[in-house]
Amino acid sequence: MAFKSGFVALIGRPNVGKSTLMNYFVGKKISIISPKPQTTRNSIKGILTLDDAQIIFIDTPGVHPPKNKLGEYMVKVSEKTLKEVDLILYIVEAIDSGIGPWDEAILEKLKEVQTPKILVLNKADLASKENIEILKSLFSGRLSFEFIIEIAAINGYNCDVLLEKIKKLLPEGPKYYLDDMTTDVRESFIVSEIIREKILLNLSEEVPHGVGVSVERFSEREDKDILDIEATIYCEKESHKAIIIGKGGQMLKKIGMQAREELEMLFGIKVNLQLWVKVKKNWRDDIAAMKMLGYNLKEV
């Protein structure tokens, strides 16, 4: 049997399960999950290697009108990804009542690319068969799809069927990554994303969008099984800094505790996590600051 390989983009509006699906296929947490828009800022790769295929999933930033240079970067990353991959998974919620504004924008973008597409109806376990059939008809009337698959990424329902359809559409090709690799991003990047996820989950809508995380130290002690991590949380306003720190430092302590617990599970080692908060005004419009915070502007 010929070996298949290729790059698969995941696109969809916020909170439809893109990151959950990629993390499910890869078998570990690669991409952070949050109900807030613009959670994913970079194209994050999750690598699944099987006996007969290697699939590189790419969780793309959402398609949205940019409000600053960071927003422009995210849109460019998403558009570039859609043009370069072998297959696009367009993910929508099976419980949706119709095609909303976010999906209208995504459909328009997808019309511009000739890449094969699969429509994935996620959260099918929560939807009626009638609603699923209505959505299939609505979306297939707007765009041509190779397959339409209903799944539940949270528990893996029908994901095996989706996987087989993905393999069917991928070209024959080589292994691009070693068998044991599940992502190509640095460990320090995953650390910064997990910290940012905890900020997204704990704070109100306004603050998280202006937050970036820089990991200054990531080192394992020679004499003890302890991983020392030092990171700085950057925000754009003094008022946001006060909110992140919280009364008596309680919010920062909560964010740090949640991040540390997840990092210890991820790395299988005790983690000593130190967090600081600094203000860098308008960093999302500052190219140098964006580079410092890990946004690879050369990609776009």
From Swiss-Prot:
| Residues where GTP binds | 12-19, 59-63, 122-125
Domain KH type-2, residue spans: 195-281
Regarding the membrane, this protein is recorded as: Peripheral membrane protein
Q: GO CC terms for this protein?
A: cytosol; plasma membrane
Where in or outside the cell it occurs: the entry states: Cytoplasm; Cell membrane
Q: Where is this region: G1?
A: 12-19
Q: Region G4: start and end of each range?
A: 122-125
Q: Name one GO biological process term.
A: ribosomal small subunit assembly
HAMAP family documented for this protein: GTPase_Era
| PANTHER family cross-referenced by the UniProt entry | GTPASE ERA, GTPASE ERA, MITOCHONDRIAL
Report the family membership. Belongs to the TRAFAC class TrmE-Era-EngA-EngB-Septin-like GTPase superfamily. Era GTPase family.
Pfam families the record matches = KH_2 (PF07650), MMR_HSR1 (PF01926)
By its UniProt entry, which NCBIfam families does this protein fall under? era, PRK00089.1, small_GTP
Q: What does this protein do?
A: An essential GTPase that binds both GDP and GTP, with rapid nucleotide exchange. Plays a role in 16S rRNA processing and 30S ribosomal subunit biogenesis and possibly also in cell cycle regulation and energy metabolism.
Chain ranges of the Era-type G domain: 4-172
Gene name of the record: era
Region G2, as annotated, extends over 38-42
Protein name, UniProt field: GTPase Era
Question: What is its quaternary makeup?
Answer: Monomer.
Keyword list, A-Z: Cell membrane, Cytoplasm, GTP-binding, Membrane, Nucleotide-binding, Ribosome biogenesis, RNA-binding, rRNA-binding
| Entry-linked SUPFAM superfamilies | P-loop containing nucleoside triphosphate hydrolases, Prokaryotic type KH domain (KH-domain type II)
Q: Where is this region: G5?
A: 151-153
User: Which residues does the annotated region (G3) include?
Assistant: 59-62
